[in-house]
Amino acid sequence: MKTHKIFWLNLAAIIIISIVVSGGMFLAMKWEQIHLKDGLKKVLSTYPIKNLETLYEIDGHDNPHYENNDQDTWYIESSYSVVGSDELLKEDRMLLKVDKNTHKITGEYDTTTNDRKDATDSTYKSYPVKVVNNKIVFTKDVKDPALKQKIENNQFLIQSGDLTSILNSNDLKVTHDPTTDYYNLSGKLSNDNPNVKQLKRRYNIPSNASTKVELKGMSDLKGNNHQDQKLYFYFSSPGKNQIIYKESLTYNKLSEH
């Protein structure tokens, strides 16, 4: 009887210890996620950059390969892609080069269309652009008025989005490597998120499409300056092609391009 009682006491102790340890680990993980989200909020709160020309005066992350007197370049890129079963069907891409040395912003708007029935039938067009007084203008004449309006009205999420609202989602996982300053955020966003609303309205994405988000970049998570980052939105609907929106902001040395 005594042995039986000791067995149950030991078992109860093991269960209690397991619960306490598990609870402690859960709270530690929960606290770590809160801490990382707070750090990312500092980074994302530096947006929006409503006027792209202010990037002339903004430095990117510190890089030991750059000299102190180097004049560097920001690259801003966005793309909207329609993807079928393992194949790209359509892509619109905007790439801008913000030259801090010449104080000029130049780039191109590309469109790619692939025929699902004929893999050899692919259409690619490129339209050179520049930014003047924070407005995108063409450097060559474009005859299609709808396309012209579409490109001239193009805006990046770093200009018009509410990036900090991404962190309001309860379905996110954030990781950060303090030795390399590399961070990664991934999870799901609701249809109420303002960035999701903006993209769905802009690209006529089905309102019921589910949205996954991924954010990658380099930062010490202290919000000291703008950092290299890549942002991905994945829109999926049953029986529909997947839609992917990508946007990136990178800071590079002129001599490397």
From Swiss-Prot:
Where exactly are the transmembrane stretches of this chain? 6-26
The main location class comes to: membrane
Q: Which InterPro entries match?
A: Csa (IPR007595), Csa_sf (IPR038641)
Location(s), subcellular: Cell membrane
Membrane topology annotation: Single-pass membrane protein
Task: Tell me the keywords, alphabetical order.
Answer: Cell membrane, Membrane, Transmembrane, Transmembrane helix
Instruction: Provide GO CC annotations from the record.
Output: plasma membrane
Q: Name one Pfam family in it.
A: DUF576
> What family name appears in the similarity comment?
Belongs to the staphylococcal tandem lipoprotein family.
Q: Which NCBIfam families match?
A: SA_tandem_lipo
Q: What is this protein called?
A: Uncharacterized protein SAV0210
